[in-house]
Amino acid sequence: MQIGIAGLGRMGAAIAARLIEVGHTLTVWNRSPDKAKPLETAGAALARSPGELAGKVETVITILTDAAAIEAVYDGPSGLLSGDVAGKLFIEMSTVQPQTEIDLARRVRAKGAGLVECPVGGTVGPARQGKLIGLMGPRTAMPCAPSRSSSNSAAGSSTSDRSATAP
């Protein structure tokens, strides 16, 4: 499975390092490209934009600062949703309000892609060791979960699933 990560802060970088360590093919992007250099040295490919990242992988993990960052990274002119993303899976791990996830899910689904929320419990150390606790939506996100987390629960419907038909 080809995985991409957008957002290489402390948690994103730790998750990316773990995925590389266990053998996943990884492409990464960050607003500050220098944060990606250690991951490139470790074997990750670098994307020049979120849109390029989404074009190269099957699954995109996002772990971003806030709702404004989510909007910029997903919806900007070269954002994750700027190209053809039909059939791709987005795993959203940012700590944001439920309405942000609901709105994002609508935009992602309108492009023919899937989105699952996956809030995590833990810090950088457990992330680096693959010992985060991940709570995710549908089981479709489970194939890459063991690399990130020691405890994974498919929680059934997510906030964005339950609200997909809301006005």
Language-model-detected regions and their locations in the chain:
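Short low-complexity, flexible loop/linker segments enriched in glycine and/or proline
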Residues: 41-44, 61-63, 108, 130-134
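Rossmann-fold dinucleotide-binding core
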Residues: 95-167
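Rossmann-fold NAD(P) dinucleotide-binding segment
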Residues: 50-114
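Alpha-helical elements of the RecA-like P-loop NTPase motor core of helicases
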Residues: 13, 37, 68-72, 102, ...
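NAD(P)+-binding Rossmann beta1-loop-alpha1 motif at the extreme N-terminus of oxidoreductases
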Residues: 1-59, 88, 93, 124
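Residue-level recognition of specific faces of alpha-helices
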Residues: 7, 35-38, 69-72, 92, ...
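Residues in the short beta-alpha loop(s) of Rossmann-like NAD(P)-binding domains
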Residues: 31-32, 66, 139
